[in-house]
């Protein structure tokens, strides 16, 4: 028992040192401004240990601590300012009106901190309350581990944080590291910091890292930060942003007013809605833009009113671009991005195109839609371009078509030149014949005059 007493005392003084190192209003875990220095922080005024100086601020939060009386076996009280260590091997190292009411409880200091669960610890602060077993409040102001079921829970510091159990569901293993008015109501939850964040009673093993007015009301949900974000179904995640809502196994990395309720869906940007399973919806911040919404499962929708570029090389020398307002892709074709440039024979290309089989067909996945074009195997065998014999890139198809068109144009030009030459020769002959006929007409006219 003497060992238990010494251990409790050592823990108490360690917690005091931890609180002092954290500075006013915080522990190592952080929190909003509040006094955690115990009696040393009280002003030296007349009256019941300076209590009048606190009346205006603290009246609404008074715990009537301590809630127990008497002296526990092997207990220790470091000061006489209304502190009570009623539990076995309990310790109150200092402060004012603190209570360590159950077995092995420790209050390091502060004002009106109270413990009624076993093996609890409060490092300091004001008006902190622990009723669950094996639970800890590091400091702060008005924090509460409120029910006996909240065992193995932790509040680091802050202001009016709560680990609650309104529906009598076990809320063991929960942590509120700091902040103000944060609340967790289910098992194994974590709130890192922030203001008015809420974990619902069915949201076991959920987490809110920080931010303001965020909520997780389903198990295994996560909100990283931001404001007014909500996870409504299990395993959903919101990274941050404002006013976002995620459903089951859905993800919103951030942005504003995005909704991802489809199972396994993703929404990002501003005003995106992914309400079908497997949807990916991303919307830009274009002024006055219409809301972007998925219309079927497993869609990929994106709006970038300033244009889209996909690069397929690390040096940004190959890729495709969809220009702002455009309806077709533009391939990167800068001469500076190319090498091993050699000329081609347009006539050879045309000859190969002439012998290339062209068919009408449907993809096996869209049997109701017809297309016209070559097979990749025939195209690769004819021209030996592209990555393999299973794909035809539009840049290769366009290049072949342009070369064939050039060859056809050259043929037409040669034929036109030949026809022009023939026509010119005929015109010359016609002109000669016309001159001959004119001369003959003159001669005939002269003969007629001489005969008269």
Model regions and ranges:
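Bacterial N-terminal signal peptides that target proteins for export
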Residues: 1-9
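C-terminal motif of bacterial Sec signal peptides marking the signal peptidase cleavage site
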Residues: 18-20
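Bacterial signal peptide processing site
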Residues: 22-25
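Boundary at the C-terminal end of the N-terminal hydrophobic targeting segment
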Residues: 28-30, 48
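Long, low-complexity repeat tracts used as extracellular stalks/passenger repeats
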Residues: 35-39, 418-421
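Periodic small-residue-enriched repeat registers in elongated scaffold domains
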Residues: 37-321
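C-terminal intramolecular chaperone/autoprocessing and neck/assembly modules of extracellular spikes
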Residues: 298, 304-404, 408-452
């Amino acid at each position: 028992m003497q060992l238990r007493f010494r251990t409790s005392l050592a823990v108490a003084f360690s917690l005091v040192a931890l609180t002092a190192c954290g500075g006013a209003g915080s522990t190592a875990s952080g929190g909003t401004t509040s006094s955690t220095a115990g009696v040393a922080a009280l002003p030296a005024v007349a009256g019941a240990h300076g209590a009048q100086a606190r009346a205006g601020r603290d009246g609404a939060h008074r715990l009537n601590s301590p809630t127990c009386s008497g002296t526990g076996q092997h207990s220790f009280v470091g000061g006489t300012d209304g502190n009570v260590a009623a539990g076995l091997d309990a310790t109150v190292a200092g402060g004012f009106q603190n209570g360590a009411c159950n077995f092995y409880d420790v209050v390091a200091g502060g004002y009106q901190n109270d413990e009624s669960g076993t093996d609890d610890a409060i490092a300091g602060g004001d008006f902190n309350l622990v009723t669950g077993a094996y639970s800890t409040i590091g400091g702060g102001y008005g924090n509460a581990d409120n029910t006996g079921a909240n065992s193995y829970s932790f509040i680091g510091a802050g202001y009016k944080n709560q680990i609650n159990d309104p529906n009598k569901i076990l809320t063991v293993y929960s942590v509120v590291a700091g902040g103000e008015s944060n609340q967790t109501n289910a098992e194994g939850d974590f709130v890192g910091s922030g203001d008015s964040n809420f974990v619902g009673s069915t949201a076991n093993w959920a987490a809110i890292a920080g931010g303001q007015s965020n909520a997780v009301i389903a198990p295994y949900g996560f909100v990283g930060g931001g404001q007014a974000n909500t996870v409504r179904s299990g395993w959903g995640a919101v990274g941050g942003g404002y006013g976002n809502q995620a459903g089951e196994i859905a993800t919103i990395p951030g942005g504003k007013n995005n909704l991802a309720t489809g199972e396994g869906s993703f929404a990002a940007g501003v005003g995106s809605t992914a309400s079908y399973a497997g949807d990916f919806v991303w919307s830009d911040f274009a002024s006055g833009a219409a809301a972007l919404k998925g219309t079927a499962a497993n869609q990929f929708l994106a709006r970038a009113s300033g244009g889209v570029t996909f690069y397929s090389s690390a040096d940004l020398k190959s890729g495709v671009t969809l220009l702002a307002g455009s309806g077709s892709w533009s391939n990167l074709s800068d001469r500076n991005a190319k090498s091993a440039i050699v000329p081609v024979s347009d006539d050879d290309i045309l000859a190969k195109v002439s012998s290339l089989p062209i068919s009408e067909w449907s993809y096996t996945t869209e049997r109701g839609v017809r297309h016209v074009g070559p097979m990749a195997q025939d195209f690769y065998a004819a021209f030996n371009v592209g990555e393999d014999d299973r794909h035809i890139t539009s840049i290769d198809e366009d290049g072949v078509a342009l070369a064939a068109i050039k060859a056809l144009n050259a043929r037409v030009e040669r034929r036109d030149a030949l026809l022009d030459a023939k026509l010119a020769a005929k015109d010359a002959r016609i002109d000669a014949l016309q001159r001959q006929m004119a001369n003959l007409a003159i001669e005939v006219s002269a003969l007629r005059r001489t005969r008269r």
